[in-house]
Amino acid sequence: MLESHLIIYFLLAVIQFLLGIFTNGIIVVVNGIDLIKHRKMAPLDLLLSCLAVSRIFLQLFIFYVNVIVIFFIEFIMCSANCAILLFINELELWLATWLGVFYCAKVASVRHPLFXWLKMRISKLVPWMILGSLLYVSMICVFHSKYAGFMVPYFLRNFFSQNTTIQKEDTLAIQIFSFVAEFSVPLLIFLVAVLLLIFSLGRHTRQMRNTVAGSRVPGRGAPISALLSILSFLILYFSHCMIKVFLSSLKFHIRRFIFLFFILVIGIYPSGHSLILILGNPKLKQNAKKFLLHSKCCQ
């Protein structure tokens, strides 16, 4: 018999899972239909579609972990499962990073030759960013496969340990390398890009307020809306990364509140940010409304 708080947690996990599948599925379907109609896909749509596919698989794994936690199902821990998990997790992180870079290059206004070069070529660089991410993540997986006996399973064992003590192993150098390669590099790139974008949008908003103070101008709220969207992206991305670091370095009892809270927050990012992307994209928002209206009519 499940305890009441576990039942509530599982219901929240199911809602989170369905929301993540729906929001990311909308992105994939809408962009897929556009690809079939026009025989081509815009760079941003390509990046969003790849990110949405990776998040669907990530959401599936998070829900699988929730089922394991709630119902005490035995987790089959083998090299293949660990490699797939690592690949999906790292690829999603890098694609989200490149999305932040893309927004920064397209929207931010920075007077620097390197930034001007990036702004002019970012659309052409998107396929190479995706390909580079695939190759980089594959190299990380190959590195982990050489240490499959203790490295990747060691990461997963932290999810299912009965103690709360910090892990201490003779693999400190490998752990530091893994942290830098898997978390620090994409996080630093993302932070630089998003902070530049936030400062640029903030400066633009102040200029608009000074220029048109006391008057109503169409589109005046657009920079503020974009700024709030980017800030929410930053908060979700950063909290997602930090919680992954905590789960990688500490042991938790699987049914304690802090562990359940961490797993729930990890799942909020791939579903919550995709919802923000849909609400901020007129094409995706319109198609999502059409889908919901069609679903109501069919009932």
Swiss-Prot record:
> Which parts of the chain does the record assign to the membrane side Cytoplasmic?
31-55, 103-124, 200-222, 279-299
Which GO terms fall under biological process for this protein?
Answer: detection of chemical stimulus involved in sensory perception of bitter taste
UniProt keyword Cytoplasm, yes or no: no
Which residues span the membrane?
10-30, 56-76, 82-102, 125-145, 179-199, 223-243, 258-278
Intervals, Extracellular compartment: 1-9, 77-81, 146-178, 244-257
Membrane topology listed for this record: Multi-pass membrane protein
One molecular function GO term is: bitter taste receptor activity
Fetch the InterPro entries from UniProt: TAS2R
Keywords annotated in UniProt: G-protein coupled receptor, Glycoprotein, Membrane, Receptor, Sensory transduction, Taste, Transducer, Transmembrane, Transmembrane helix
What GO CC annotations are associated with the protein?
membrane; plasma membrane
Q: Which subcellular locations apply to this protein?
A: Membrane
Q: Does the keyword Nucleotidyltransferase apply?
A: no
Instruction: Name the major location.
Output: membrane
- Which residues does the record list as glycosylated? 163
Record family assignment: Belongs to the G-protein coupled receptor T2R family.
Kindly give any further remark recorded in the entry.
Answer: Most taste cells may be activated by a limited number of bitter compounds; individual taste cells can discriminate among bitter stimuli.
Listed name of the protein? Taste receptor type 2 member 1
